Amino acid sequence: MTPEMLYALRDQAGVPSHPVVFLILGVLTFALHIAAVQVMLGAASLTLRGAFSASQHWRRLAAAMITTAKIAVSVAIVIGVAPLLFVQVVYDPFWYTSNVLSAWWVIGFIVLLILGYIAMYAFYWKNHDIVADGGRGGVWMVLSIALLLAVGFIVHSLTNQMLFPEHWMAWYAPQGVVNPDGHSLHYWHLPRFLFFIALSAPVTGAWLYGYRRYLQGGQEADAAYLGWLRGLAQNLMLVGGVVSVL
């Protein structure tokens, strides 16, 4: 891939404002999107942990977190459109090429997202009263988390691929043989991906603080539950923060 080819792929109309504006908006909207993703991962994990526990505190938390996880997926999808559009505005030739190189995964990303959301709702439908009855159908929540993580990994890989135009030709025509099937993901950076996943722990801890504050504002009478929530939130923020840094 030569600079001349990249120039040829540019939109001749240009961008409607200075690129810095779109870069800043892209970072801000991505931060909101990834925060929703991390809340979703944390809430789904807490739901899975708590629904099958004998502890009433854990079960009560699971009942609240399944609702949080469902809403967080919706928020992540809606807000995620904005940074994607900003990426396309600024880096369109790079993003387009990366998508073409892994076209099957671009379509698969949408399918996996839909299936992951359906699996989460399947768990929700099977558990009308987690506090009283405990959890049922845990395999659905495990499947949901796995599929949503796969969705994140696909986007992570596509984003990394667009950063290395010097490798595009080798990926498209390995050893000089053109391979246009789009079946492969060609590049990823696992530590970077795991870093964003690990951040879900401290972010979820902060979310639990907000949840605890919400209960206090509603005159929650169960002081033991509030104290337990505070301890769990502190542990998630402390341990999760250390793991993320390492």
Which role fits each region the language model picked out?
Residues 43-68, 85-97, 123-136, 206-235:
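Juxtamembrane membrane-water interface segments of multi-pass membrane proteins
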Residues 1-30, 57, 61, 85-105, ...:
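Membrane-interface interhelical loops and short amphipathic "cap" helices
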Residues 37-47, 107-124, 194-212:
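Hydrophobic cores of alpha-helical transmembrane segments in multi-pass inner/ER membrane proteins
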Residues 40, 65-68, 72, 76, ...:
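Small-residue packing motifs within transmembrane alpha-helices
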Residues 33, 65, 195:
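Divalent metal-coordination and catalytic microenvironments
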